[in-house]
Swiss-Prot record:
The keyword RNA-binding applies. Pfam families: Ribosom_S12_S23. The lineage of its organism: Bacteria, Bacillati, Mycoplasmatota, Mycoplasmoidales, Mycoplasmoidaceae. HAMAP family: Ribosomal_uS12_B. This is Small ribosomal subunit protein uS12. The gene is rpsL.
Length: 139
């Protein structure tokens, strides 16, 4: 335990909270080549690689992922949610934060139904999360 004299000399430091999605915290101003520390909930990027990845130990699958170069210069791994996708290299995507627990290094999700990414076909429940349109009512 520190004495009062020690605390006066050197006060306790606050713990810095580390971001779980650091690529969303920076903006790049290309006019004056400055990086500003401003948080944005979504970022646009271009796919540089699209593929599948196997998850960590107890799980087994082929999870779809894309490597995306963001507008602020960061290059990150993103998860493509839902069944089936139309993403290729050079597709423009929108991404949000949110990691995938069983894929190491994947800290972001692609937003379905925006820019070049189409929504999930024939999705009935939780449609807004997968960018699916409301199905036509049978008459």
């Amino acid at each position: 335990m520190a004495t009062i004299a020690q605390l006066i000399r050197k006060p306790r430091k606050k713990k810095k909270v580390k971001s779980k999605s650091p690529a969303l915290h920076y903006n790049l101003n290309l006019l004056n080549k400055k990086v500003t520390n401003v948080y944005s909930p979504l970022k646009r990027g271009v796919c540089t690689r699209v593929g599948t990845m196997t998850p960590k130990k107890p799980n087994s699958a082929l999870r779809k992922y894309a490597k995306v170069r963001l507008t602020n210069g960061f290059e990150v791994l993103t998860y493509i949610p839902g069944e089936g996708h139309n993403l290729q290299e050079h597709s423009v995507t929108l991404l949000r934060g949110g990691r995938v627990k069983d894929l190491p290094g994947v800290r972001y999700h692609i937003v379905r139904g925006t820019l070049d990414t189409v929504g999930v076909e024939k999705r009935r429940q939780q449609r807004s999360a997968y960018g699916a349109k409301k199905p036509k009512a049978k008459s």
